[in-house]
Amino acid sequence: MEQQQNSYDENQIQVLEGLEAVRKRPGMYIGSTNSKGLHHLVWEIVDNSIDEALAGYCTDINIQIEKDNSITVVDNGRGIPVGIHEKMGRPAVEVIMTVLHAGGKFDGSGYKVSGGLHGVGASVVNALSTELDVTVHRDGKIHRQTYKRGVPVTDLEIIGETDHTGTTTHFVPDPEIFSETTEYDYDLLANRVRELAFLTKGVNITIEDKREGQERKNEYHYEGGIKSYVEYLNRSKEVVHEEPIYIEGEKDGITVEVALQYNDSYTSNIYSFTNNINTYEGGTHEAGFKTGLTRVINDYARKKGLIKENDPNLSGDDVREGLTAIISIKHPDPQFEGQTKTKLGNSEARTITDTLFSTAMETFMLENPDAAKKIVDKGLMAARARMAAKKARELTRRKSALEISNLPGKLADCSSKDPSISELYIVEGDSAGGSAKQGRDRHFQAILPLRGKILNVEKARLDKILSNNEVRSMITALGTGIGEDFNLEKARYHKVVIMTDADVDGAHIRTLLLTFFYRYMRQIIENGYVYIAQPPLYKVQQGKRVEYAYNDKELEELLKTLPQTPKPGLQRYKGLGEMNATQLWETTMDPSSRTLLQVTLEDAMDADETFEMLMGDKVEPRRNFIEANARYVKNLDI
């Protein structure tokens, strides 16, 4: 963390516009007013403290969920300026807390780089809180001011003397705005806190839950920064080279940090950040890194004779197989684009990342020939598998061209050709598949029965995956292609429903299918196309009356409502095959009465770790997970 000019005072605070609009249209400022928006408030305040840390003035940040679900954030930075603001005639801290776009981030003299737009954060949080209290330790005095829904209810008061500096912000989210929930999720906050600690080398971040019955505390501090992050992400994988490669450089005011390490898996995980903001959609910095990596590895392999003269170069996918990498850049003027504004658009970031990374990576490969050879060998194996997969794909295409219909024989397709209303049910077992085919609405519902369990794609390369019949049937039915051939626009169905039995085998098949979709068709999950059917667990019959219960709690409630006599008959479904076509339609497939769970992707890093832990080669992480969670099991299927 570097020291910068210590001229962070009231004159650096620029004012752009008023606050009234925030309460009317909160979604424009924090994305939404659901749980996501609620948690966003915390980051708006924490980002201010992180900016102080990046500038070299803050070493400790403390986040507390109070007993009443309010939030307190404490840092030991310089303290928000308290002098009178020249243009506004009010204390600078009040301007920051009550005026939108007032902050020390706009003309570059307060901070070189910053994450969220400073001051947008504080004032928006203030506007969306029933109460906000700010305490500033600065210039030997303790200053305090209180606000209600964005309006100051006290002047800035001096309440004591101090021998240190820093800012404490306490806020209570407004239930009128956050009508869905004002309940904070500790794990969600702790995950992001850990990420921020990795990205801000050396800073000490503590998070504490003070709510009754939920008390816990975590402290995060990583001297290794993103190098430690890569080690953390690879902790349950077999690594190809012991030490992660770490590269840092600066050019034209842009700082680039890259850490990478190869493991023995078949997928790559690259996470990129700009000013600590996760650029989920990638961008120019990520593109520069990928270009540089492919070029450096191919150049090295040719110089050392590991790729023969007439052989083609390794592709980008080849050199990235089994790669875990973090790219973190600090940019004074980042331009974000893409659907969710999480894609970096600055063209200079591509060139600078490529140049700085390539130079250092070349040096690493020359100085570490053993690790370099292992990296090249992994790429060569990936290339061979890619060629085999290409042949398998071509074979599939050739077969398709020779057949009258190129759709799998067991697929009962729907008559509609409109993907936006079409649904594909992937059903466990032929018997349930038969009932589903009879019970469905043929106009928009297609059925694809699966025989047995599909291949665990976490442990296999693409060539092996493509030789598996069940996987091939799914790929052909969905129409999107997979991997580098994937094209979402070719999807034949906008609802893909996984329908399996409610037992352990059904859960296993569901996990295998989700692993396949996540690894090779991630966009169908990201775009909300994947659903899980909820077949009932019980059938309750009393005379001619038939009711269904989807879990034990529902069954309990249902039995309470029924008369004592005659005694109701109870059937627990062991599998989908026990239901006839009509029952399956009424309970699980009829859009007017069914329950579907949509599969969403909140945190790619978390999802990746979960699939690796559940489906990967290492047994130890799975055993640890089972030991830690065994006490929560309600239904044990032995």
Curated annotation (Swiss-Prot):
Per the record, the domain of life is Bacteria
Query: Residues in domain Toprim?
Result: 422-536
Query: What is the protein name given in its UniProt record?
Result: DNA gyrase subunit B
Summarizing the function annotation, the protein's role is:
A type II topoisomerase that negatively supercoils closed circular double-stranded (ds) DNA in an ATP-dependent manner to modulate DNA topology and maintain chromosomes in an underwound state. Negative supercoiling favors strand separation, and DNA replication, transcription, recombination and repair, all of which involve strand separation. Also able to catalyze the interconversion of other topological isomers of dsDNA rings, including catenanes and knotted rings. Type II topoisomerases break and join 2 DNA strands simultaneously in an ATP-dependent manner.
Answer whether the UniProt record assigns the keyword Repeat to this protein: no
Kindly list the positions annotated as binding Mg(2+) 1: 428, 501
GO BP, sorted A to Z: DNA topological change; DNA-templated DNA replication
- Primary site of residence: cytoplasm
Known Gene3D superfamilies for this protein? 3.30.230.10, 3.40.50.670, Histidine kinase-like ATPase, C-terminal domain
Further comment found in the protein's record: Few gyrases are as efficient as E.coli at forming negative supercoils. Not all organisms have 2 type II topoisomerases; in organisms with a single type II topoisomerase this enzyme also has to decatenate newly replicated chromosomes.
**Where exactly is the site Interaction with DNA?**
453, 456
Query: Mind listing the UniProt keywords for this protein, alphabetically?
Result: ATP-binding, Cytoplasm, DNA-binding, Isomerase, Magnesium, Metal-binding, Nucleotide-binding, Topoisomerase
Q: Quote the EC number.
A: 5.6.2.2
Could you say which cofactors this protein requires? Mg(2+); Mn(2+); Ca(2+)
- Which species is this record about? Bacillus subtilis (strain 168)
Q: Where in the cell is it found?
A: Cytoplasm
Reactions it catalyzes: ATP-dependent breakage, passage and rejoining of double-stranded DNA
Tell me the protein family, please. Answer: Belongs to the type II topoisomerase GyrB family.
Q: Which CDD domains match?
A: HATPase_GyrB-like (cd16928), TopoII_Trans_DNA_gyrase (cd00822), TOPRIM_TopoIIA_GyrB (cd03366)
Known InterPro entries for this protein? DNA_gyrase_B_C (IPR002288), GyrB (IPR011557), HATPase_C_sf (IPR036890), Ribosomal_Su5_D2-typ_SF (IPR020568), Ribsml_uS5_D2-typ_fold_subgr (IPR014721), Topo_IIA (IPR001241), Topo_IIA-like_dom_sf (IPR013760), Topo_IIA_B (IPR000565)
